[in-house]
Amino acid sequence: MSSSYLKLDFKLKNQVVPFESYQKQVSQIHNAVKSKSVEEKDWLGWLNLASDYNKEEYAKMEEKVAQWLKDKVEVVVVIGIGGSYLGAKTGYEFIFGKYSIKKPQMELVFAGNDISAETLVAKLNYVKDKKFAINVISKSGTTLEPSIAFREFRNLLEQKEVNSWEYIVATTDKQKGVLFELATAKKYTKFVIPDDVGGRFSVLTAVGLFPFLCAGIDAKKVLEGARQMNKELFSENVMENAAYKYAVARHYLHKEKKYAVEIFVSYEPKLRYFAEWWKQLFAESEGKDGKGLWPSSAIFSTDLHSLGQMIQDGPKILFETVLTLENPAYDITFKDNVIDYDKLNYLSDKKLSEVNNVAFNATMEAHSDEGNVPNISMLFKDFSEETLGALFMFFMRAVTMSAYLLGVNPFNQPGVEVYKKNMFFLLGKK
């Protein structure tokens, strides 16, 4: 099964997923979501964002980016936690990566996603002698981690810039909340987190699009990839809809075959943060009422030298979902050395991408055939903006189906509020 951006395959030794037996349930969920007749209908705004995004707000985002570029801003500090930063961080790493030949037009530094004094001080020191701007992202403005970071970076910016308000953008609620009120009082530029879009589904709003534009990522291409993927996932037929097929396969492995863990694997280090975004998406959407697969991640072949032994010979509690690259933009072809000191001449005329692909196939065979670890493999097209948007949409559509198959609300996260309540109590917040 494939789309323009993603091809799925299943290597499930001695197991056949009865996809068609789930068709009635899948159709019911599909039609309920499509008609917005589900109880959680007020959280489905993300479904049509790729086609119906706010073009007036998008133009204002472009204007702000142009202003910052004109003013020679070097770094944009993106402050947020969870869904308020993971999508933007994922896109930034997907397009650029740490050592990419392609460089961002403004560097993004992500803050407010922990409460480490060491880390915050290091980031403040990193930007203090640079021309920097701030994009603070929070629907309420009361989440502790980003609030602390915003206060410290704001204080630093106000010391450096007379007109500091021109270099702060708040992405928040459209009419209420602590951050909205602060931004209004200080005359910061404001962009909106829509009421009908939850944090982990917000990457195609200003939450993700504005940081993308700051970095020089073509956000319209991201939206186009998401729109195209949405179009390709129109069918309610589980055999024709790749996202639903993935959702059914993981549901079957979990509920019928009793696998407890799904490990999201890639052979591309640039996907490390995509895995982090995926983990939040599935953990917060499914982990309720004592239900849900435990989402984990690994980068191969690196983690084969740590986790590989456990996956191969450890308890049979997990299956793998493996995302591999079809068209690398860069490659290396090995040549013979005159003297084969390193004994690598057997790789002569092979490309490094071929070696990586052999590692993938050898590992999948070892894990699935000998280790009895089921594998769901996905081949993604390239590291382009369009593919990025397509992957975002694919997994958001998949997790919605998967959570409803499990019988839980995909769009709330009541468990997250418990630690916040305890923390605020211990800190003496009134």
UniProtKB/Swiss-Prot annotation:
Belongs to the GPI family. NCBIfam families: PRK14097.1. Keywords: Cytoplasm, Gluconeogenesis, Glycolysis, Isomerase. It comes from the Bacteria. The lineage of its organism: Bacteria, Bacillati, Mycoplasmatota, Mycoplasmoidales, Metamycoplasmataceae. It catalyses: alpha-D-glucose 6-phosphate = beta-D-fructose 6-phosphate. Its EC number is 5.3.1.9. Signal peptide: none annotated. The gene is pgi. It is found in: Cytoplasm. Disulfide bonds: none annotated. It comes from Mycoplasmopsis synoviae (strain 53). Its main location: cytoplasm. GO terms for biological process: gluconeogenesis; glucose 6-phosphate metabolic process; glycolytic process. Pathway: Carbohydrate biosynthesis; gluconeogenesis; Carbohydrate degradation; glycolysis; D-glyceraldehyde 3-phosphate and glycerone phosphate from D-glucose: step 2/4. This is Glucose-6-phosphate isomerase. The active site is at residues 284, 305, 420. Catalyzes the reversible isomerization of glucose-6-phosphate to fructose-6-phosphate. InterPro entries: G6P_Isomerase (IPR001672), Phosphoglucose_isomerase_CS (IPR018189), SIS_dom_sf (IPR046348), SIS_PGI_1 (IPR035476), SIS_PGI_2 (IPR035482). GO terms for molecular function: carbohydrate derivative binding; glucose-6-phosphate isomerase activity; monosaccharide binding. One of its GO terms (cellular component) is cytosol.
